[in-house]
Structures are given as C-alpha cells and as structure tokens.
C-alpha cells in the first residue's frame, strides 16, 4: 500500500499541458534520451527551440513565395501545422485539477498515440480543425447571422463559455448578455484577445487592433474572412456586429474542440504513466526487464528536471525572479522518486534473501547428492570385487575335495598338537599358580593395553583434524589478504583516475595523503613487525575525521567550480537570446521584402492586362492600320520585355537576400552547435567527476564505519 500511495502521489503531480508556442521543442533520438543529463538536456532543448524557430521562419517565407495570399505567424502555425510534435518524455501532470488557463500553458502531442497529422484536414490545413477551418469557397456567409433567434442562441453559447472559463476574473472586465447584444469596441477587443490567447498563450498583441485581428483571422484561416474588412474592425458595433458575433462564436467553437483534444491528451498521458509504474511494480525476471526498469527510472528523473526547467522558464517569461516554489516541487518530486527506488531496493533485497535461502537449501541437497554418489561408487566397486571373489571361489571349489583330505590330515595333526599344547597349558597354569599369578590378571592387562591403543588412535585423529583446520585457516587468511590487496589497488586506481579527470578540467588537487601503500613483506599477526592500522594509515589525526575532512574539502572545491560553470552557462544563454532577437529582426525584414515582391507582381499583372487590351483594340483595326499595328506590337513587346526584365532583376535580388539570410542562419547554427557540444562535454565531465567522487566518498565512509 505505501508503494501504491507513493506512485499515486507522483501521478497526481504530473501535468501533460506543458507547451508554450514561444518554446517549440525538438524531439531527441532514443540514444540521446538515455545519455543526456536531466539539467543540461533542458538547456539543449531550449537552444534547439531557437534553431527550430528560425527554421520555421524560413519555412513561412517559402510558403509566401508559393502562395502570395498566405502569411503564417511562426508562433501559431507553420508549414507543418499549429501543433508541434513534442517528445513524449517532455510532459508531466502535476495537478489534474488545473483550470483551463493553465492547461493552455502547454499543448504536447504524444508521439505514440497522437500525431500532428491526425489534426490535419483533407485540404492540409495547418490549423488542423477540418470541420470548421476550411476556407469557404463563396463570398457569402451561409449562417443566418441576421436572424434574431440565431443571434440569441450564439450569444448565449458565447456568454456561457466565457462565464464557465472565468473570463471576468482573467480580464477584470464585466460581461453580460447585454454586452454581446450592444457591444463596445473595448468589449469586442477584450473578448477577442482572451479567446485568441487561449489558443496561443505565448502571443503578444503589439500592433494596431485592426491589423492584428485581420492577420490573426487570416492565420487561423477563418472561412468567412472575405465578409470582413479592416475598416469594419475599427468600429464593430451597428449593422456589422452580426459578422463579428459569428466570428467570436467560431473562436469559441475552436476552443471547445481544443478542450476536448486536451482532455484526450491528458487521459492518454495518465494511462502512459500508469503503465510505466505498473512496469516498475512487476518483478524483474531477466536483463531486458532490468533495462526497461532502468529506462523508466531515467525517464521519471528527466521528467522531474524538465518540469522544473519549463516552469522556471515560464516564470522568467513572466518577469518573475522567485523560483523557490518550483525548487520545492522538484525536491518533493525527488523525495517521492527516491522513495519508490528505496521500495524497489527493499523488494529486491527481500527477493535476494529468499533466493539465497533457496540457494543454501539447493547447495545442501547437492552436497548430500555428492555424498550419495560417492557411496554408490564405493558400493559398485565392492560389488565388482565381491563378484571377482565369487568367481575365484567357484574356480577353487573343484580343488576342495583334495584340500579337504589334506585338511583332515592336518586336522588330525592339529588335534595331536592341541593335546600337546593342552598339556603344556596345564603345566604353565601349574607353574603360574606356584608363582601366584592368574589368567584373569593377564586378561586385565591385555584389556588395558587395548584401551591405551584406542586412546592413542583418538589423539592421532584429533591431531590430524587440528592440522587440517590450521591449513584451511591459512588458506582463508591468504584469500582475505589477496582481497585486501585488490581493494587497496582499486582504491589507489580510483584516486589516480579522479586526479586525472580533475586535471583535465584544470583543477589541480593533492591526493597523496589519501593514498594507501602496503609494505613489501607482510609479517604474520601477533608479531612486532605485523601490519597494523597505524602503519597502514600513518597520520597524527584520527583516521575517519582526517580522511573525511580531506574529501569534504575536495568536494567543496568541486562545487565552487560547478557554480562558476553555471554562471558561465547563464552568460552563454544571454548571448543566445541576443542572437535570437537578431534572427527575428532579420525575419521581419525578409517578410517586408516579400510584401514588396507581391506588390510588384500585382503591378506586373496590371501592366500585362493593359497591354493585352491595347493589342485587342489594335487587332480590330488591322485592315486599316497595318503599319500602326506593327509599330504598336513592337512597342508592346518592348514594354513586356522591360517588365520581365524588371521582374527578373527583382527575383534575383530576392534570391541574393535569401542566400544571405540562409548563410547567416547556417553560421548561427554552427555557433549554436559548438556551444551545445562545449556544454555537453562540460556537463559529462562534471557529472563523471561528481559520480566518481560520490562513489569514493561512499566507499571511504563504508570502510571507516567498518
């Protein structure tokens, strides 16, 4: 239950709605996702977002060249659509009950479940709402906007949507049905800005409202844009209000469908997180399961860092400098993350203990099996020997009659000998009785002799056991000493690697006092020259505190260098921001040049129409004015040649400007890539050094505690 509660608390803080149009994300490859560090990955993604913004501006310029009537804003829609592809590991759900305004702070798209292509209409509409964003082929709006009942219905829908989504709180502007029936210019502007900012929270209104409303509707591909002109936008009341009321209702419909998409994305992401945690709760059966679990842990840690960086960047965009709340959320998330890992470690330890018990049982069974096999082998050998003995006895049974006769003869001889011996025994007994000795006394002496022989055998067996015990103890001591030598050698190698890595980073430290040197000859214990702790660690200070203080001082130096590197990275980020502003200014210049080109093309079209009219008029009078027609044709051809020459020159000029812009963009990309490589190399070096130092500190602390 605690594990499930901790997983549920982690899921409760995951928020899939983490998208800002000012920060388009670039999906990373699978290998880069596994290797990148959680902190530096966010910086790399921010730099990639700047590159993607410039690429999107170029794609917009290409779209203008192909179609003079399309001018796309890079913050809302590009050639690939309004919904940018977002990596599935870049979104978290911190609070499922956030309001819709916070939900629109981001708009991620799952690579596995949802794709930007799913939102494209049949006409390749970049907005992606196929049912209501297709341009209307006619010039007339088919909706009955002049009908009072229809107006009341859509006014009620707009009013309900504004009230349900806290329009008055967000804008500090009162709203009522009367406002929608008798609008003012201010109320229309406020409602339009609020509805559009729900679609694109990163957009900032800077230009005149007439220009911006018309351009934004053009970007959104409002199907009835031909029924609205810029002059009407400056005064929306009166007879023209039904057109703008229908336009506001269209924006409300877009927002409602966007809400539905966001809910779908939220549910998909929650399902994905639940699947991830379900995978973590499953037992590990093989190496592949362990790798999958490791990837899940890395993704959880990356998501925590990305969530923190995204929130901090949004706070920075809002001109706020207090990031303490985001840091507290990051700490709380990591505490839950560590709790999950600890639970997993405890489960693994309990499984290891159970498996060790099973191993001991199996090992005992194997020992018993070995003993049984030895006994079986010995019995088989005895069986073979007994069979050979039986065979030999069968061969000798044929000789037994002769031997029996010999044995009978020998038996008779033995009987005679027994008689003689019996007589001798009686004589000996008589002599013993005369000497005062008895047979019982002699038997007692023999029994004492046998008892002493048994005791001698037992002492010899104990001596053999003691010798074998001494040999096994000596072997164990040699193994322990070899392990001790390997540990000392590994410790010194780690110190050298740590010193080498720090020197590569320009950090010269002294680690000679930390080295451990073994004497050439190790004397047996309990002697004057035996190896002791004082000889192994020759220092005047207490050993744990001395080494701990030295390691802490080295760690503090490394942390100071890390802080310095962070300051340098912040300066690099500021330079990147300046370069981004310069790219945006170049993009606006390119847009103005394209507008000029469209005007020139329009003038060229008018000139050609005039020339064709003159040619048609002269062709009617060809019989009467042949000479004049010939001269007129020459003049017309000359004018056409001049016009084409002018167009060619303008196209060449545009090509030159575009090449200059592409060259500048490529140079800037090279600089940014160089900065990314330097930041990555620096980050990997710092991470490697920090990990090794932590391992060294942990090893030293463990040895000190022992």
Curated annotation (Swiss-Prot):
InterPro entries: DUF5595 (IPR040967), Kinetochore_Ndc80 (IPR005550), Ndc80_CH (IPR055260), Ndc80_sf (IPR038273). One of its GO terms (cellular component) is nucleus. The keyword Nucleus applies. Keywords: Cell cycle, Cell division, Centromere, Chromosome, Coiled coil, Kinetochore, Mitosis, Nucleus. GO terms for molecular function: identical protein binding; microtubule binding. Its main location: nucleus. It holds the Pfam family Ndc80_HEC. Residues 38-49 have a biased composition (Low complexity). Residues 1-70 are annotated as: Disordered. Residues 18-32, 50-66 have a biased composition (Polar residues). This is Probable kinetochore protein NDC80. It comes from Candida glabrata (strain ATCC 2001 / BCRC 20586 / JCM 3761 / NBRC 0622 / NRRL Y-65 / CBS 138) (Yeast). The gene is NDC80.
């Amino acid at each position: 239950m605690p594990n499930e509660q901790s997983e549920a608390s982690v899921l409760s803080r995951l928020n899939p709605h983490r998208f800002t149009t000012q920060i388009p994300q670039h999906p990373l490859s699978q290998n880069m996702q596994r290797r990148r560090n959680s902190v530096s990955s966010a910086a790399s993604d921010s730099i990639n977002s700047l590159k993607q913004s410039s690429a999107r501006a170029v794609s917009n310029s290409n779209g203008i060249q192909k179609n003079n009537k399309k001018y796309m804003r890079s913050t809302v829609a590009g050639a690939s659509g309004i919904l940018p592809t977002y990596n599935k590991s870049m979104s978290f759900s911190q609070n499922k009950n956030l309001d819709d305004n916070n939900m629109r702070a981001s708009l991620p798209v799952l690579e596995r479940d949802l794709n930007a292509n799913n939102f494209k209409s049949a006409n390749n509409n970049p907005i992606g709402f196929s049912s209501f964003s297709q341009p209307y082929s006619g010039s007339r709006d088919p909706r009955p906007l002049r009908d009072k009942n229809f107006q009341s219905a859509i006014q009620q829908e707009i009013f309900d949507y504004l009230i349900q989504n806290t329009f008055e709180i967000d804008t500090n502007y009162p709203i009522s049905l009367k406002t929608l029936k008798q609008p003012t210019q201010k109320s229309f502007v406020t409602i339009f800005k609020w509805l559009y900012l729900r679609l694109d929270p990163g957009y900032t209104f800077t230009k005149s409202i007439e220009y911006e409303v018309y351009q934004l509707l053009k970007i959104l591909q409002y199907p009835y844009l031909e029924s609205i002109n810029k002059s009407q936008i400056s005064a929306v009341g009166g007879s023209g209000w039904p057109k703008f009321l229908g336009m506001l209702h269209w924006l409300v419909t877009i927002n409602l469908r966007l809400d539905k998409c966001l809910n779908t994305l939220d549910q998909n992401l929650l399902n994905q997180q639940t699947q991830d945690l379900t995978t973590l709760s499953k037992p590990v059966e093989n190496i592949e399961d362990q790798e999958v679990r490791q990837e899940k842990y890395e993704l959880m840690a990356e998501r925590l860092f990305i969530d923190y960086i995204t929130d901090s960047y949004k706070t920075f965009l809002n001109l706020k400098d207090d990031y303490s709340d985001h840091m507290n959320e990051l700490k709380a998330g990591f505490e839950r993350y560590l709790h999950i890992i600890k639970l997993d470690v405890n489960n693994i330890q309990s499984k290891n203990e159970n498996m060790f018990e099973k191993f001991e049982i199996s090992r005992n069974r194997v020992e018993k099996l070995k003993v049984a096999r030895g006994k079986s082998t010995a019995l088989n050998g005895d069986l073979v020997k007994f069979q050979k003995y039986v065979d030999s006895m069968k061969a000798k049974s044929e000789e037994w009659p002769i031997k029996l006769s010999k044995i009978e003869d020998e038996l008779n001889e033995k009987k005679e000998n027994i008689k003689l011996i019996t007589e001798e025994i009686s004589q000996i007994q008589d002599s013993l009785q005369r000497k005062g000795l008895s047979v019982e006394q002699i038997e007692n002496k023999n029994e004492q002799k046998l008892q002493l022989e048994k005791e001698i055998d037992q002492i010899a067996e104990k001596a053999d056991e003691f010798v074998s015990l001494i040999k096994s103890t000596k072997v164990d001591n040699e193994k322990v000493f070899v392990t001790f030598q390997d540990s000392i050698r590994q410790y010194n190698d780690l110190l050298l690697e740590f010193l080498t890595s720090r020197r590569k980073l320009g950090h010269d430290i002294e680690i000679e006092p930390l080295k451990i040197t073994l004497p050439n000859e190790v004397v047996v214990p309990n002697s004057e020259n035996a190896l002791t702790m004082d000889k192994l660690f020759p220092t005047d200070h207490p050993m744990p505190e001395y080494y701990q203080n030295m390691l802490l001082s080295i760690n503090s130096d490394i942390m100071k260098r890390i802080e310095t590197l962070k300051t340098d990275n912040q300066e690099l980020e500021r330079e990147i921001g300046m370069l981004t502003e310069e790219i945006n200014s170049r993009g606006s210049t390119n847009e103005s040049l394209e507008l000029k080109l469209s005007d020139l093309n329009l003038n060229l079209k008018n000139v050609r129409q005039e020339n064709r009219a003159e040619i048609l008029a002269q062709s009617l009078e060809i019989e009467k004015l042949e000479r004049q027609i010939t001269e007129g044709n020459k003049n017309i051809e000359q004018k056409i040649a001049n016009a084409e020459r002018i167009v060619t020159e303008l196209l060449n000029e545009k090509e030159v400007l575009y090449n200059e812009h592409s060259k500048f963009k490529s140079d800037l990309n090279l600089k940014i890539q160089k900065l990314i490589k330097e930041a990555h190399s620096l980050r990997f070096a710092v991470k490697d050094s920090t990990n090794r130092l932590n391992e060294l500190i942990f090893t030293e602390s463990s040895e000190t505690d022992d």
